[in-house]
Amino acid sequence: MLTCNECTTWEQFLNYVKTRCSKTAFENWISPIQVLEETQEKIRLEVPNIFVQNYLLDNYKRDLCSFVPLDVHGEPALEFVVAEHKKPSAPVASQKESNEGISEVFEETKDFELKLNLSYRFDNFIEGPSNQFVKSAAVGIAGKPGRSYNPLFIHGGVGLGKTHLLHAVGHYVREHHKNLRIHCITTEAFINDLVYHLKSKSVDKMKNFYRSLDLLLVDDIQFLQNRQNFEEEFCNTFETLINLSKQIVITSDKPPSQLKLSERIIARMEWGLVAHVGIPDLETRVAILQHKAEQKGLLIPNEMAFYIADHIYGNVRQLEGAINKLTAYCRLFGKSLTETTVRETLKELFRSPTKQKISVETILKSVATVFQVKLNDLKGNSRSKDLVLARQIAMYLAKTLITDSLVAIGAAFGKTHSTVLYACKTIEHKLQNDETLKRQVNLCKNHIVG
């Protein structure tokens, strides 16, 4: 093996990289690499694991070409050897020793844990048509973890209650199933956790910890996109827990089919139940406003609550922001709440009740999102039951929400005006008796106007 002084080419590369990445990244990913052999034809490197090798090539391949020998294809002539971590033979550990090992790694891993928010519980989650289904699913899996809907995949826009439900599941299980091991973590924290254990050469300890869980709660899985190496480890953990009938709950801003992840992990996420959290309707927004106001000791009359909810309709966080602003104004200036006060204090948050012009394309995108179908399929000619229904709802909403003629609407869908008319009559007839369809149509409307 060459000494460090002999590794001049590699040292030059290291000095170059140090100036182009953070100290943490260098220590985590570059510093652990050791030179085993260096010749004019190639360099042999020892890496602690395959993640480090892939990181080096994914991020510094072009730079490596300027320093290290190249092969006949113009690629860096590097040979990688993954270090072997030999363990002395030992008798099989007892259950007590095994638990102690898991407890030890828990102490290392808990720094990455997302603490459950004490305010996020089922009993203070305001229910409405846009979230009724997903809340019922969350309550169901919290009551019987691992029995059904596994994994539960919750998706929806920012500030609509995904994290609230995730933490509510954690609280319920912790209180009603005290013997179960629970871990709540953001995707970014999972990645940082893995980096930490890669650096300390203790990935096996991390694997043992995660695979000893009874309930894994993962927030914002969309941040796993474009992180292929970490995605593989997450997928392995995911599969192990599912195969052991351990419950997993995941949140995301998109349904699995729209995430830029491998087909393998997308298929796994769709194994259980995929549930959408929609934009709350007016009545639900009013209920949320009044609940948040009550928590702050602020009394909002119904008329005023409806007025605010009619002008703030993006998400729950905006409603919370409005309450915080009104509470601060009343306390700081010692004034009571009036319509003028509301209008002046919240004017920067208000949006006009007459939303921006709605187009057929807007309607198609919203319906595709709500029904979790591809936009091209919705515009196409597929006669599958789900697509036909979604397409008819889109036509019905186009006729209801925009002023274009049936001919123009039909042209936008690539259909005749008679097809649009038939679709509208079909949906209107079904709406008279089908409560599920009513909820679906309202969900689409909320998504469009929100």
Swiss-Prot record:
A molecular function GO annotation: lipid binding
Keyword Amino-acid biosynthesis listed: no
Domain of life of the organism encoding this protein: Bacteria
Keyword Thylakoid included in the entry's annotation: no
Family designation: Belongs to the DnaA family.
Record note on domains: Domain I is involved in oligomerization and binding regulators, domain II is flexibile and of varying length in different bacteria, domain III forms the AAA+ region, while domain IV binds dsDNA.
Protein name according to UniProt: Chromosomal replication initiator protein DnaA 2
Annotated gene: dnaA2
